[in-house]
Curated annotation (Swiss-Prot):
Protein role: Allows the phage to evade the CRISPR/Cas system type I-F.
Keyword Chloroplast: no
Recorded superkingdom: Viruses
Protein's recorded name: Anti-CRISPR protein 30
Length: 90
C-alpha cells in the first residue's frame, strides 16, 4: 500500500494521485482526503497524518473509524456501517 511505501504524506499524496480510482475531500471535523484504489484499499490523509484502510477487513474499517475525530466519524457513520455490512456478507 502507498502509506507503507511513503511515510511522508506529501510523497504518499503524489503517489496516490497517480493511481487512485477515486478521490474524495471531506471537510467535516479536521478535514481529510480519501484516495480509493482498485484493490479496495483506501488511503486517508489529514494534515501530516494518514491511515491506510483495507475495505475488505472489518478490523481495518473499525481502525479507520477510531482514527477519525468525532465530527468526521459522525459524518462518515453511514459509510462505515455500509463497509462493515459488506464485509460481514462475504
Amino acid at each position: 500500500m502507498i502509506a507503507q511505501q511513503h511515510k511522508d504524506t506529501v510523497a504518499a499524496c503524489e503517489a496516490a494521485e497517480a493511481i487512485a480510482i477515486a478521490k474524495d475531500q471531506v471537510w467535516d471535523g479536521e478535514g481529510y482526503t480519501k484516495y480509493t484504489f482498485d484493490d479496495n484499499s483506501v488511503l486517508i490523509q489529514s494534515g501530516t497524518t494518514q491511515y491506510a484502510m483495507d475495505a475488505d477487513d472489518a478490523d481495518s474499517i473499525k481502525g479507520y473509524a477510531d482514527w477519525l475525530d468525532d465530527e468526521a466519524r459522525s459524518a462518515e457513520a453511514s459509510e462505515i456501517e455500509r463497509l462493515l455490512e459488506s464485509v460481514e456478507e462475504e
